[in-house]
């Protein structure tokens, strides 16, 4: 499981506690440091990495991901643009049953870019299959 823009990493911590193999990522050094301390304090093992969506090679090397999570990521236009290009590459829907579902789950508080982002995905043939947005 991959969490993008993890911040404090609550979804990543919860998934790791349930036994998932987790990589939690963020651009902010402070967020990464806090998540590492929180995981250590709670005895949770997960991988943590500082990643820019404009330089996604480390994430793509580990793709395809069965599940990609994110929350409140679409607060800037550039985030929406970068994610629109990146998400289908991170979690492609495989035709092989053993390759995973390639599911993307995003929770957004209703920011303006979220609507445009969802419309872009709905316009693409694979959009509805790989993407769900909860506002």
Regions found by a protein language model. Name each.
Residues 1-135:
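S-adenosylmethionine-dependent methyltransferases
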């Amino acid at each position: 499981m991959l969490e993008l823009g993890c911040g404090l990493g609550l979804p990543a911590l919860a998934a790791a506690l349930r036994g998932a193999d987790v990589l939690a990522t963020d651009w902010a050094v402070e967020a990464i440091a806090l998540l590492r301390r929180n995981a250590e304090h709670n005895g949770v093992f997960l991988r943590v990495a500082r990643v820019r969506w404009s330089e996604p090679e480390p994430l793509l090397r580990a793709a395809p991901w069965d599940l990609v999570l994110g929350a409140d990521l679409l607060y800037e236009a550039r985030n929406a643009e970068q994610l629109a290009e990146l998400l289908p590459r991170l979690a492609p829907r495989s035709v092989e049953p053993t390759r995973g579902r390639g599911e993307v789950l995003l929770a957004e508080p209703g920011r303006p870019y979220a609507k445009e982002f969802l419309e872009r995905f709905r316009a693409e043939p694979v959009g509805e299959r790989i993407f769900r947005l909860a506002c």
